[in-house]
Structure formats: structure tokens, C-alpha cells
């Protein structure tokens, strides 16, 4: 398929701007960087709650680091596989994907996501990646009705889970609860896919694919995770595979750094959970360079810790390879980036360390639970009387959705998922706390 079809935008543009020689993907990057949805990431939880410390990452700084790692991966692959330089294309494209990858995630991290998914359980569900797709293509007001109106290839690259929610959902897998406070995230995992409300955009993105490619690309299978009841997609595009690797590396390495600096992960935990696996790795570089890196990671000398972090990132970035799946005709689907097996295992060990000692830490879970309750409380309030409680512009969207017979509950999810942690907390106080002040300070943000 020619590259021009992947540079097409859903809504034709005739912008004649003076001396503007930017490529289509440079324009995409600019639209993402200058969007309100991207700015809001500065006040959304990454792993550690916003306000706990002024050192750790927010979703904004995480996204910037993912972008840097993503372009580093592309540069390495370009040198390692010169025959694939045309496929790698524009660095601006990969920057766009990495900068935008978390743009749809709601306030309070996973707690907010599970809460919205539960409140939307009869209305198509909620999932952060699906919301990212929706913001880029419909909600962000760069255009009247086409969101940021990004290139088709950019939209293909943001598709981490290329199948509709209804195709992936397995009914009867959720226990009913009688009280919101009893909601367990493990029992209500979001379906990882595109909302059915956005099927028109999904179809447009996949339009250039052959019938066989589309069928295979959107195929689903049972999940390999024992506690995940829904079906899962199997494939992603080449650009998406690079973005996802960059995200995984940033999560495993940089979120680990935050936890080390804040004293949440200790040297003894590293020696117990990570060092043995690295020392027995089948890769000699991992055995020699990473097995003893814990000394630097937990050093009180900041420059030694930063050197260790750099070594980890470099090790993973340079261990990425390109795989060929000839069952696909379209090169953007045929080729995918992945980590060499021993490095994939090492990265997984780091991710499990973060999950075990950071994500599952009771103090972190209490913050997540609190955010979960805030989001459900807000949704319940707005759903009870949308034309009374929603801000005026959101009321108008809700009314239009009702009049056109669309899913008006999706408008509520759009509004709440766009909030920052702080704004959602303040709005909750305004609605439910007798001691809260007036709504004046909230009005400008609505």
C-alpha cells in the first residue's frame, strides 16, 4: 500500500499557512503537544499519587520519557536494519504515538479506569487506550467533529488493541455488587479494545487493508492471563510495537527509579527478587553488566544511580529486534519490533518488582481506592440529572447524544475521564462535602 494513503486525514484540510513546510507527522506531533488533553497529563497519576513527592513522574513526564526512548529505539533499528529504513519513516510519527499513548487515561490511574468501566458496564465499558483513540479522533477540539484529525498511520499506531469492545467482552464474568465501596478491581478488569461508539473511525483507519489482513489483524483469542476473563487481540502495527516497548521500558526502569529514590523499593528486595534472575540469564551481557548493577542503583551518590538507570535503558533499547510475519501483506503489519527473549525476561522481572513492591503497596492501593470512589461518586451524581449538574457545554453534548439516539452515558465518561486528579477531588468535595466552598473556583475549569 502506498505511503500516501497512510498520510490521509479523515477530514480533508485546506490550511494554507505561510511558509509551513512541515511533514504530515510533524503536524500531528504539534497537535498533540499543544492539546489540552496532553497538558492535563501533568496532573494525572502515573504510579505514585500526585502530591506525594515532587520528584517522581506524572503521566506527562512519563510520556516525554517514552517519546525519548521510542525515538532511540527507532534510531537503533535504523542502524541495525538499514533495509527497513523506509518502514521506520518519520521520527515525528513515533514521537506522536509516544506522547499521545496515555492521553485517554482517567484521573487516579487504574482505580479511575476500573471505576469508569464499572459505571459504564451497561453502556459499552471504559478502557484508557480506547479513550485515547476517541480523544484523538473525536473529542479534542482541534476540529469541530474529527478531534485532532490525525493521519491514518498515526491512528493505526495508537491502536494497541485493534478490535471492538463487543467482540472481546465475555458476558457473565463479573460478580454483581450491592455497594460501590465493595468494588474489587480484580473482578472488573476493562475490556481492552475500541469502543463500539467509535466503530466508524476504526473502520476508516483499517480501510486500506486487504480483507485477509483486516480479518487477521482484528482476530481475537482467549487471554493467557488466568484472572482476565475477556478475549484479547493478537496483533499490532509496527509503529505501535515500538511505542509499546518504549512504554514498557519507561515503566519498568523509570518508575523503579522513583520507587528507589522514595525508599519504597530496597536493596535487599532487589537482591532477593531481581539479582538471581539476572545472574543466571542466558545472555552474557546481562550476566556481566546487569547482575551487579544493584550497587549503583541503590547508591546514595545520585550520579551513580543515574548511570545505572542509563545502562538499563540502553541495554533494553539495543536488544530490540524486528520480526517478520509473512502472513500479512501490509508491511506495517508484517513487521513488528520485539525484545530478544533474555532481555524480555529481564524486563518482566523489573516490571514484577515494581508491581509487587510499589503498585500493591497498601498506601498506594488506598490512594487508588479513594480515587475509585471519587470517580464512581461523580458519575452517579452526573447520571442522576445531567441537565442540572453537568457544565453547559457538556450538557449540550449530552442532549445532542440523547436526541440522536446515541450512547449518552459515553458523554459522562468523556467528561470525567478528562479530569485531573486534583480537579476530580475538588469537584467531589463541592458536590458531597457540607464544608466545601462555592463553585466559583471550579467554573473556569468546566
Curated annotation (Swiss-Prot):
<dbReference type="GO" id="GO:0006203">
    <property type="term" value="P:dGTP catabolic process"/>
</dbReference>
<keyword id="KW-0378">Hydrolase</keyword>
<feature type="region of interest" description="Disordered">
    <location>
        <begin position="1"/>
        <end position="28"/>
    </location>
</feature>
<feature type="compositionally biased region" description="Basic and acidic residues">
    <location>
        <begin position="7"/>
        <end position="28"/>
    </location>
</feature>
<dbReference type="Pfam" id="PF13286">
    <property type="entry name" value="HD_assoc"/>
</dbReference>
<protein>
    <recommendedName>
        <fullName>Deoxyguanosinetriphosphate triphosphohydrolase-like protein</fullName>
    </recommendedName>
</protein>
<dbReference type="InterPro" id="IPR006674">
    <property type="entry name" value="HD_domain"/>
</dbReference>
<dbReference type="InterPro" id="IPR003607">
    <property type="entry name" value="HD/PDEase_dom"/>
</dbReference>
<feature type="domain" description="HD">
    <location>
        <begin position="59"/>
        <end position="252"/>
    </location>
</feature>
<dbReference type="InterPro" id="IPR006261">
    <property type="entry name" value="dGTPase"/>
</dbReference>
<dbReference type="GO" id="GO:0008832">
    <property type="term" value="F:dGTPase activity"/>
</dbReference>
<dbReference type="InterPro" id="IPR026875">
    <property type="entry name" value="PHydrolase_assoc_dom"/>
</dbReference>
<comment type="similarity">
    <text>Belongs to the dGTPase family. Type 2 subfamily.</text>
</comment>
<dbReference type="InterPro" id="IPR023023">
    <property type="entry name" value="dNTPase_2"/>
</dbReference>
<dbReference type="Pfam" id="PF01966">
    <property type="entry name" value="HD"/>
</dbReference>
<dbReference type="InterPro" id="IPR050135">
    <property type="entry name" value="dGTPase-like"/>
</dbReference>
Amino acid at each position: 500500500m502506498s505511503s500516501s494513503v497512510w498520510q490521509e486525514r479523515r477530514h480533508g484540510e485546506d490550511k494554507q499557512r505561510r511558509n509551513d513546510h512541515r511533514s504530515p507527522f510533524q503536524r500531528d506531533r504539534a497537535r498533540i503537544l499543544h492539546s489540552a488533553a496532553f497538558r492535563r497529563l501533568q496532573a494525572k497519576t502515573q504510579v505514585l499519587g500526585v502530591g506525594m513527592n515532587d520528584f517522581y513522574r506524572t503521566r506527562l513526564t512519563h510520556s516525554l520519557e517514552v517519546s525519548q526512548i521510542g525515538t532511540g529505539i527507532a534510531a537503533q533499528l535504523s542502524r541495525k536494519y538499514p533495509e527497513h529504513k523506509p518502514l521506520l519513516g518519520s521520527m515525528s510519527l513515533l514521537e506522536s504515538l509516544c506522547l499521545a499513548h496515555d492521553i485517554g487515561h482517567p484521573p487516579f490511574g487504574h482505580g479511575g479506569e476500573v471505576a469508569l468501566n464499572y459505571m459504564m458496564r451497561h453502556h459499552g465499558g471504559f478502557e484508557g487506550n480506547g479513550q485515547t483513540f476517541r480523544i484523538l479522533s473525536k473529542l479534542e477540539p482541534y476540529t469541530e467533529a474529527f478531534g485532532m484529525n490525525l493521519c491514518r498511520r498515526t491512528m493505526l499506531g495508537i491502536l494497541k488493541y485493534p478490535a471492538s469492545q463487543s467482540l472481546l467482552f465475555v458476558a457473565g464474568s463479573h460478580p454483581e455488587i450491592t455497594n460501590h465501596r465493595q468494588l474489587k478491581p480484580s473482578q472488573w478488569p476493562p475490556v481492552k479494545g475500541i469502543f463500539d461508539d467509535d466503530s466508524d473511525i476504526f473502520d476508516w483507519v483499517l480501510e486500506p487493508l486487504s480483507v485477509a489482513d483486516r480479518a487477521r489483524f482484528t482476530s481475537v483469542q482467549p487471554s493467557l492471563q488466568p484472572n482476565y476473563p475477556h478475549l484479547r487481540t493478537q496483533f499490532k502495527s509496527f509503529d505501535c510495537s515500538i511505542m509499546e516497548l518504549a512504554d514498557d521500558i519507561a515503566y519498568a526502569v523509570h518508575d523503579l527509579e522513583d520507587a528507589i529514590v522514595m525508599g519504597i523499593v530496597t536493596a535487599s528486595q532487589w537482591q532477593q527478587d531481581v539479582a538471581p534472575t539476572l545472574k543466571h540469564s542466558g545472555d552474557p551481557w546481562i550476566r556481566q553488566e546487569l547482575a551487579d548493577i544493584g550497587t549503583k542503583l541503590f547508591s546514595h551518590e545520585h550520579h551513580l544511580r543515574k548511570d545505572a538507570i542509563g545502562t538499563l535503558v540502553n541495554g533494553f533499547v539495543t536488544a530490540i529486534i524486528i520480526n517478520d510475519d509473512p502472513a500479512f501483506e501490509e508491511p506495517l503489519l508484517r513487521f513488528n519490533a520485539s525484545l530478544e527473549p533474555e532481555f524480555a525476561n529481564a524486563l518482566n522481572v523489573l516490571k514484577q518488582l515494581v508491581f509487587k513492591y510499589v503498585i500493591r503497596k497498601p498506601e498506594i492501593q488506598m490512594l487508588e481506592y479513594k480515587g475509585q470512589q471519587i470517580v464512581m461518586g461523580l458519575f452517579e451524581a452526573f447520571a442522576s440529572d445531567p441537565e442540572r449538574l453537568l457544565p453547559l457545554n457538556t450538557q449540550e453534548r449530552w442532549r445532542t447524544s440523547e436526541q440522536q439516539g446515541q450512547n449518552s452515558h459515553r458523554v459522562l465518561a468523556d467528561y470525567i475521564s478528562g479530569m485531573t486528579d486534583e480537579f476530580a477531588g475538588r469537584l467531589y468535595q463541592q458536590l458531597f462535602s457540607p464544608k466545601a466552598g462555592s463553585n466559583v473556583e471550579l467554573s473556569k475549569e468546566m
